[in-house]
Regions:
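Short, solvent-exposed secondary-structure capping/transition elements
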Residues: 74-78, 149-158, 176-177
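Helix-hairpin-helix/helix-loop-helix acidic hairpins
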Residues: 54, 67-134
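C-terminal accessory module of base-excision DNA glycosylases/AP lyases that mediates lesion recognition
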Residues: 1-43, 48-51, 57, 156-307
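Generic structural signal for hydrophobic core residues of well-folded globular domains
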Residues: 66-72, 87, 118, 142-147, ...
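Enrichment for repetitive, rod-forming helical segments
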Residues: 45-47, 68, 83, 148, ...
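Surface-exposed cleft-lining segments at the edges of enzyme active sites
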Residues: 101-105, 151, 181, 185-186
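Catalytic DNA-binding helix-loop module of base-excision-repair DNA glycosylases/AP lyases
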Residues: 119-170
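Phosphate/adenylate-binding glycine loop and adjacent helical scaffold
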Residues: 62
Length: 307
């Protein structure tokens, strides 16, 4: 007899967490860096839309996204001019651009303009004049925010991001989504394959318009948060006071080896979080994310030990 594992408990665990994350994001009381950053970008999109929509407004949007999401376009020469020219060529009105992005998401093989824009074209140059390469992460973030302006769109657009890519495999393992799903933070796959992988995961988690956020918005919020835990980087998950409380609780404020070494501090934070401390913060959603991350990590470790 073939024995099949029942992953329904794990799936339900994530679904309950998604509901809490969704409520937290839309709550007027939410004051973490993630929500604040997202709202700032959306305000820029709204004030630069409609009659104000032009190539200059697109460039402004790209600069703000790049700055807040640290996609590092500013290290290139002339990337935003190239990117804004490409996006503006999709249509002279936002409605045209939104429609093309939606068509690409639904039938990616049929909208070559966006496929080539995200996957093939290069933007900006290096100091020596050589091409600086593509901008997949920034462009998917732009598409993500662009579709959020359409209140009738319940699906949204997935962000191609190292945190999401890094957590895709362990989450698939946790919910029993098997098959060839090799994806990591360093993977560079085409946008169509990435779209299909995220669609499949969203279906497995039964994300189908049942949350107050778009489908890909809530999926990205979940993967991003788990990725932040895995990096030991909580600055955008907490407000300043909560973050300082966490540092003090783990006595990292006494760490003097190298105060400017952010990576080292992140590693120490992660190590302390792995010990499973509870009730360090009076923040229910953070506590729930923390516990789930420990469950997720335990699943990963168990599978690795069995191999």
């Amino acid at each position: 007899l073939e024995y099949k594992l029942d992953y329904s408990k794990n799936i339900n665990e994530i679904k309950k967490l998604l509901e809490k994350v969704s409520e937290d994001i839309v709550s007027s009381n939410s004051n973490n860096g993630y929500t604040s950053q997202k709202q700032k970008i959306l305000r820029i999109f709204r004030t630069t839309g409609g009659e104000n929509y032009n190539q200059e407004s697109i460039e402004l949007r790209l600069i703000v996204i790049d700055s807040l999401y640290s996609t590092n376009m500013e290290k290139r020469y002339f990337p935003f001019e190239d990117l804004s020219t490409e996006i503006y060529s999709l249509g002279r009105t936002e409605k045209e651009v939104i429609k093309k992005i939606q068509n690409f998401r639904n039938n990616p093989d049929t909208v070559l303009e966006i496929l080539n824009m995200i996957d093939d074209k290069e933007y900006g140059i290096y100091k020596n004049g050589k091409s600086a390469g593509g901008a997949k992460s920034l462009l998917t973030k732009y598409c993500y925010f662009q579709l959020m302006l359409d209140t009738d769109d319940k699906i949204g657009f997935p962000i191609y991001d190292s945190l999401a890519k890094n957590m895709y495999q362990p989450v698939c393992n946790y919910v029993g989504l098997t098959g060839k799903r090799k994806l990591s933070s360093s993977s560079d796959i085409n946008i169509i394959a990435y779209l299909n992988m995220m669609k499949e995961l969203a279906t497995k988690l039964d994300i189908c318009g049942q949350y107050s956020l778009q489908n890909f918005d809530i999926l990205d919020a979940y993967l991003w948060r788990m990725g932040k835990f895995s990096e030991g980087n909580f600055s955008l998950l907490l407000n300043k006071e909560e973050y300082l409380t966490l540092i003090k609780a783990f006595k990292l404020n006494e760490y003097e080896k190298d105060k400017n070494n952010t990576i080292e501090v992140n590693t120490l934070l992660k190590e302390e979080m792995l010990k499973g401390y509870k009730n360090v913060l009076d923040n229910e959603i953070f506590s729930d994310l923390w516990k789930h991350w420990l469950h997720l990590l335990g699943k990963m470790e168990n599978e690795n030990n069995e191999q």
